Regions:
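Generic structural signal for small/hydrophobic residues in well-ordered secondary structure
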Residues: 30-31, 64, 82, 98, ...
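Conserved beta-strand->loop/alpha-helix structural units within folded catalytic cores of enzymes
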Residues: 69, 85, 101, 207-211
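Buried hydrophobic packing segments
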Residues: 82-87, 108, 112, 213, ...
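Active-site phosphate/pyrophosphate- and oxyanion-stabilizing loops and adjacent acidic/basic residues
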Residues: 62, 160-163, 283, 287
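Active-site region of PLP-dependent enzymes
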Residues: 180-186, 193-293
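Conserved PLP-binding active-site segment in aminotransferase class I/II-type PLP enzymes
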Residues: 1-80, 84-88, 93, 167
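Short amphipathic alpha-helical/adjacent loop interface patches that line ligand
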Residues: 57, 61, 133, 282
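PLP-dependent aminotransferase-like
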Residues: 88-177, 184
Length: 293
């Protein structure tokens, strides 16, 4: 019998497959609109309306709120930045503990370390590969400050039970929803059941702008803290654009550009279509692979 390519046989495909392209002419048109203005970022780290970014960034945040039926959204330059900002907003710091899944991308754990905290790994359940709720209960200690539930491969953790546990223990529940945009748990969008949820705009995610991330929450306080983290921790009260007189949080440059925001807006509008395409590709692979013994 012929050897498979992995073992030295002749490959069926002798050149790399073309990357899957989700950028349409609409995104190209929007990107050109921004390029023609010459204003590729709308941020200023000072009091004023531009502390919260430019018009495209604000429009993307409005669209995220509308799409996922949530009060506040905060764009940042990556989902890793979003996880870090959310943990800071939750008050996670030195010697705290953050419960999370070991079955995830590294940032779900390393962002806790970036805050000076310790990631506590809790095993996953076997049906959806998400945090096992009963094991989460056993892992909670007086040092537990947050639970980071990872919704992986489009599947949701048992978010209602995790939220109930978090509320009872006065712990913040953060959803790492990078791999499940548009998924629902009991008819509620994943990413919106926890105190905060994280979305990714990385190039291989469903909605992509090359790099980027979004934090969503129903808490004005948490949203404002994330905004401060995003823009150097400048002491600005966003609602009134008045100088606050003191800094109460250390911030970074986690700002998303106008160009990225303009590309993300039409991508978000096509979320259902993009998810359906991925589901069709997955179904095809499952069907073909099942033919092998």
């Amino acid at each position: 019998k012929n050897k498979i390519a992995l073992l030295g046989g002749q490959p069926i495909q002798d050149s790399p497959l073309k990357p899957y392209n989700t950028i349409s002419n609409v995104e190209i048109k929007k990107a050109n609109e921004v390029l023609n203005t010459g204003q590729l970022s709308g941020y200023i780290a000072a009091p004023g309306e531009n502390f919260l970014g430019g018009k495209w960034t604000k429009k993307l945040e409005e669209d995220f709120c509308r799409k996922f039926e949530i009060k506040y959204s905060v764009t940042v330059n990556s989902a890793t930045s979003a996880l870090h900002a959310a943990l800071i907003a939750a008050g996670v710091g030195e010697d705290d503990e953050v419960i999370t899944s070991p079955y995830t991308m590294a940032a779900s754990a390393t962002t806790a370390v970036m805050c000076g905290a310790k990631p506590i790994f809790v095993d996953i359940e076997t049906d959806y590969f998400c945090l096992d709720v009963e094991k989460v209960k056993k892992a909670i200690s007086p040092k537990t400050k947050a639970i980071m539930a990872v919704n992986i491969f489009g599947q949701a953790a048992n978010l209602k039970k995790l939220r109930k546990i978090a509320d009872e223990k006065n712990i913040i529940l953060i959803e790492d929803n990078a791999q499940a945009p548009g998924a629902k748990f009991h008819n509620i969008y994943t990413g919106t059941i926890g105190h905060m949820g994280i979305f990714s705009l990385n190039r291989h995610k469903t909605i992509q702008t090359g790099e980027g991330g979004v934090i969503v929450t129903n808490s004005q306080c948490l949203a404002n803290r994330c905004r401060l983290v995003r823009n150097h921790g400048e002491a600005v009260i966003p609602e009134t654009n008045e100088f606050n007189g003191h800094e109460d949080i250390i911030g970074y440059n986690y700002r998303l550009t106008e160009l990225q925001s303009a590309i993300a807006i039409p991508q978000l509008r096509r979320l259902e279509k993009l998810n359906k395409q991925r589901q069709e590709l997955a179904s095809f692979l499952f069907e073909e692979i099942s033919k092998f013994n």
